[in-house]
Amino acid sequence: MLAFKSDFLHIMSERGFIHQISDEKGLDALFSKEVVSAYIGFDPTASSLHAGSLLQIMMLHWLQKTGHRPIALMGGGTGLIGDPSFKDEARPLLTQDDIATNIVSIKKVFANYLTFGEKETDACIINNAEWLCKLNYLEFLRDVGKHFSINRMLSFDSVRLRLEREHSLSFLEFNYMILQAYDFVELYKRYGLRMQMGGSDQWGNIINGIELGHRLGTPQLYAFTSPLLTTSSGAKMGKSLNGAVWLNADMLSPYQFWQYWRNTEDADVTRFLKLYTTLPMDEILKLSALQGTEINEAKKILATEITAMLHGRDLANTAAKTARKTFEEKTFGENLPTIEINASDLKTGAGLLALLVQAGLAKSNSEARRHIQGGGIRVNDQIIEDETCLILEEDINAQGIIKLSFGKKKHVLIKPL
């Protein structure tokens, strides 16, 4: 790989962000001589991004930190269709109101990573519905559609693999690739953007935009993709046994977010410190040298640094403190997830199975029953073997709460009112 002269590409290379770049020398020269505006597209089909998007957000963070302008493109227009890339089935279509509501919610996250304003390197959030929803279809087909070869589009892995598995690809979704390519050209015309970044699964879509720009007379545009990350065990980033690891605090608490990263596999610690934190490389190298049980300290630092960037240093430290009290001091951490129940329910006894489901420690009564049969459920740190167990007033501790646990790392406090 090229020894980059520009700060941005040097950091991207050093920390492991680079999968593929369309023209390394040309892009490095561009970054070295001027402020570059670049963008990443984000899918607004949910009300929050999850941890799988954090790599791209960190790329925008470093872009701005090295003196360039980051743009977060919200797919308000393309989101009405859905990206078919490597999906086996079409997604349910959302309304424009659904998409708009999701975008408002998603925007909150970016303020924790980027500085917004009117300066040359200040970040901006743009919605592609601004131009896509105003397109004249016949004019678009005539002026843009003519530049796309169906034969070539069918050769893209994202499409080919889906067709090989005999999953249909609707004409609606096929248009997504053309619209995304058009986004790149439109963003150059409106904002002077020269580079699009994304995951490696977006390479074909980004190259389409570069080639369309060339045919329509733009200066050279550039593609930059990052690896599609999985954990060492092959799990997708941003997913846990309990579902998506959401970035919005109202969908996943800072403590639960911290705990997700604390549970990082040993083999992933160094890689994640490079990608998801801004710790200096020399400090990361020191942490990566830790062995045995000492690596747990590196995991705590990883979890705290990532949580601090998203939720703030105070909440990150509180999450770390809660974990320490819960796991090391065997006391009740102040920031553990808490649910409230009627105190009167405990007079006759509340069923443990139902409480486990209500607390989110099981998805159903049958799953809660399996947890108990496997010896994984504890009440106030005491293993429960009876699936008909009732939680009573006498189970309330001196702090006025009851602690439910599944395994060693999942705890919920029950607060009777």
UniProtKB/Swiss-Prot annotation:
A motif ('HIGH' region) lies at residues 44-53. One of its GO terms (cellular component) is cytosol. One of its GO terms (molecular function) is ATP binding. GO terms for biological process: tyrosyl-tRNA aminoacylation. PROSITE patterns: S4. Keywords: Aminoacyl-tRNA synthetase, ATP-binding, Cytoplasm, Ligase, Nucleotide-binding, Protein biosynthesis, RNA-binding. It catalyses: tRNA(Tyr) + L-tyrosine + ATP = L-tyrosyl-tRNA(Tyr) + AMP + diphosphate + H(+). Residues 350-417 form the S4 RNA-binding domain. Its EC number is 6.1.1.1. InterPro entries: aa-tRNA-synth_Ic, Rossmann-like_a/b/a_fold, S4_RNA-bd_sf, SYY-like_C, Tyr-tRNA-ligase, Tyr-tRNA-ligase_bac-type, Tyr-tRNA-ligase_bac_1. ATP binds at K239. It comes from the Bacteria. L-tyrosine binds at Y39, Y176, Q180. A motif ('KMSKS' region) lies at residues 236-240. CDD domains: S4 (cd00165), TyrRS_core (cd00805). Homodimer. Catalyzes the attachment of tyrosine to tRNA(Tyr) in a two-step reaction: tyrosine is first activated by ATP to form Tyr-AMP and then transferred to the acceptor end of tRNA(Tyr). Belongs to the class-I aminoacyl-tRNA synthetase family. TyrS type 1 subfamily. This is Tyrosine--tRNA ligase. It comes from Bartonella quintana (strain Toulouse). The gene is tyrS.
